[in-house]
Swiss-Prot record:
It is an enzyme of class 7 (translocase). SUPFAM superfamilies: MOP-like (SSF50331), P-loop containing nucleoside triphosphate hydrolases (SSF52540). Coiled coil: none annotated. InterPro entries: AAA+_ATPase, ABC_transporter-like_ATP-bd, ABC_transporter-like_CS, ABC_transpr_MalK-like, ABC_transpr_MalK/UgpC-like, Mo/tungstate-bd_C_term_dom, NA-bd_OB-fold, P-loop_NTPase. Gene3D superfamilies: 2.40.50.100, Nucleic acid-binding proteins, P-loop containing nucleotide triphosphate hydrolases. One of its GO terms (molecular function) is ATP binding. This is Maltose/maltodextrin import ATP-binding protein MalK. Its EC number is 7.5.2.1. It catalyses: D-maltose(out) + ATP + H2O = D-maltose(in) + ADP + phosphate + H(+). It comes from the Bacteria. Residues 4-234 form the ABC transporter domain. Keywords: ATP-binding, Cell inner membrane, Cell membrane, Membrane, Nucleotide-binding, Sugar transport, Translocase, Transport. The gene is malK. It holds the Pfam family ABC_tran.
Length: 371
């Protein structure tokens, strides 16, 4: 195991900056997930750690050693790519041992490591098969095994589940999580799927346009996003946003006016520092935190546009006339409502988020469980 530290790391191609002033501390044995939309620089960041991309400026440390100019083979890292990249003419055992043979490892060492890793990954009964005889999940396990036999200090995974169907992705997520718990290796995992990030990570790094938007534990990012980008990216369906105007402030409270015909006002338990009366801000509320109207004091009303019945839950898209946008309401039950009907939902102030015009969040003061 080894720690990974990035200090003011920047990557640029000419005048195009794809990673800017990245500062990260990844501890020994941590499972860290880089997540963000396409083009945010997450794979580039992983490739700089691996040594497949040069660092324009800043420093990279693996363990206590500066690695900027160290060749990839000498960094003690192993990498799994989105593509399995297996040799079709070689067996599972031969694919897994290929790197060790190139490195000149002794035959008994190779056999011992391959057999140990095959047991961990449940591949022992498949060692003599060729890749064409394997399922997609089995091929991905072989690709992971090929990296594991090299015994890297840091394990890098670049969107390893993207080529799998939904059921296999769930299965492989569970297997990767178990593998990390069993081996205790430092793992850095890249994905655009925030569900993978939330379920796998000890710590999530959210990237936006080449910068670190927020670093934290999954529930910290879910309940206390640092800005509107993180709030909208983490969570599915995404957070609802409403334009509001500040009408008053007090210690640890901000009063805002909702965009409804009755101009209803509500006090939100958020940090009021630097918030000015009259400022235009955004109120955020997650679909699952909206309430049935009969148990709430603050009511929003609109017309039902779409109803999605998922069996265990219902998602209702409601158009609020005064702002001409849809809110998503999610309830863990069957809700029978017709499209076109008028539907009222409740807004709990303690579950609301408030964002300034520049997108930064006013710190929520409501204590959430598990954080």
């Amino acid at each position: 195991m080894a720690s990974v530290q990035l200090q003011n790391v920047t990557k640029a191609w000419g005048e195009v900056v794809v990673s800017k002033d990245i500062n990260l501390d990844i501890h020994e044995g941590e499972f860290v997930v880089f997540v963000g939309p396409s083009g945010c620089g997450k794979s580039t960041l992983l490739r700089m750690i691996a040594g497949l991309e040069t660092i324009t400026s800043g420093d990279l440390f693996i363990g206590e050693k500066r690695m900027n100019d160290t060749p990839p083979a000498e960094r003690g890292v192993g990498m799994v790519f989105q593509s399995y990249a297996l040799y079709p003419h070689l067996s599972v055992a031969e694919n897994m041992s290929f790197g060790l043979k190139l490195a000149g490892a002794k035959k008994e060492v190779i056999n011992q490591r391959v057999n140990q890793v095959a047991e961990v990954l449940q591949l022992a009964h498949l060692l003599d098969r060729k890749p064409k005889a394997l399922s997609g999940g089995q091929r991905q396990r072989v690709a992971i095994g090929r990296t594991l036999v090299a015994e890297p200090s840091v394990f890098l995974l670049d969107e390893p589940l993207s080529n799998l169907d939904a059921a296999l992705r769930v299965q492989m997520r569970i297997e990767i999580s178990r593998l990390h718990k069993r081996l205790g290796r430092t793992m850095i995992y890249v994905t655009h799927d925030q569900v993978e990030a939330m379920t796998l990570a000890d710590k999530i790094v959210v990237l936006d346009a080449g910068r670190v938007a927020q670093v934290g534990k999954p529930l910290e990012l879910y309940h206390y996003p640092a800005d509107r980008f993180v709030a909208g990216f983490i969570g599915s369906p995404k957070m609802n946003f409403l334009p509001v105007k500040v009408t008053a402030t007090a210690i640890d409270q901000v009063q805002v006016e909702l965009p409804m015909p009755n101009r209803q006002q509500v006090w939100l338990p958020v940090e009021s520092r630097d918030v000015q009366v009259g400022a235009n801000m955004s109120l955020g509320i997650r679909p699952e935190h909206l309430l049935p109207s009969d148990i709430a004091d603050v009511i929003l009303e609109g017309e039902v546009q779409v109803v999605e019945q998922l069996g265990n839950e219902t998602q209702i898209y409601i158009q609020i006339p005064s702002i001409r946008q849809n809110l998503v309401y999610r309830q863990n039950d069957v809700v029978l409502v017709e499209e076109g009907a008028t539907f009222a939902i409740g807004l709990p102030p303690e579950r609301c988020h408030l964002f300034r015009e520049d997108g930064t969040a006013c710190r929520r003061l409501h204590k959430e469980p598990g954080v």
